[in-house]
Amino acid sequence: ESPICNLENPNTRLVESIMKRVLIFDALNAYLRAYIVDPSISTHGDPIGGIKGFIKILQRHVRETKPDQIIIVWDGPNGSMKRKSIDKSYKEGRKPIRLNRAFHNLTDNEELQNKMWQQSRVIEYFNNMPIIQFMLPEIEADDVIAYITQLSRYDGWQKIIISNDRDFMQICDNETILWRPTKNEILNTERIVEQTGVHPTNMALARSIIGDTSDNLPGIKGAGFATVGKRLNFLSDSRSYTIDEVIEFCENTKSKLKFFTNIAENRSLIEHNYKMMQLYAPQMSVQSKIHVKESIENFECEFNKTEIIGMMRDDGFGELNWEVLKEN
């Protein structure tokens, strides 16, 4: 059952109201999820689950949310470059993404080539749909998505981010919601505070203390959301706290817990992590911001169904139900 339909808290619902709605996809997150789990094979005998699965994911969320606009954002070529220039070990140690099933006719290199082909191909499909798509060189999708949610154009809109990445919790507010598909959960400000004990305005600070193993950013020893939410419970406030204030609190507390000492003695680690994690000020050039803003303002909604059907025929799979996309 859709989480939209079974949420008890009305503040967390994707409200069917006068608010316009923009659906924003963290594209690589969705594509890799589809690529890994969708077993679809083309009539040519090649894996096409990345393409087919991502399109199905898109259709499902369009059905559920009925958006006025759809934006798909990819990590750009060398997208991690800015953060790697600060920390060369950023994102190191990640295991390569592999199919969770074996194809006896594909070598490791052929599987990699197929994955890259499917990604470029699904981008072509979306270019023929009424979708705004971004892939900016040397910029990560997280920064572009964060910037889009800040655009005055979307003031008063409900902004739904589709991603399993918890980094986006920091930019959630009354209008911006994070839908985490693998958890089948929708997070708004209230839910985030309830789950983590931390308000979105203080989320980057809290995560700078906790660290992020997926990005190879170690945190303070013994710090997790449960501990941070309990020991630094003021981070649940909507007021934005600074690293200085947290350090000062830890230095002046009467508690003898090692947790506070560890924070007070590791300011540089926390400051470093904050610089790497924060999305409040997206790491984008002025030119990149102008490009995104103007691309959205000048977008003309088109649906090239004939081209899509031809592509599907070439790629060896049958027609899906496109009407749900055409209506938007």
Set out the residue ranges of the language-model regions.
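Short hydrophobic transmembrane-like helices used for membrane targeting/insertion
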Residues: I4, V15-I18
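Short hydrophobic targeting helices and cationic amphipathic motifs
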Residues: L7-P10
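Detector for intrinsically disordered, low-structure N-terminal pre-sequences
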Residues: L14, R21, T242-V246
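Noncatalytic, basic helical substrate-engagement surface that gates or grips nucleic-acid strands
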Residues: K20-K159, F168-I186, Q278, Q283-N298
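Non-catalytic nucleic-acid-binding/docking modules located in mid-to-C-terminal regions
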Residues: R63-W74, S89, G93-P96, A102-F103, ...
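Acidic, His- and aromatic-enriched active-site or binding-groove loops in soluble protein domains
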Residues: I162
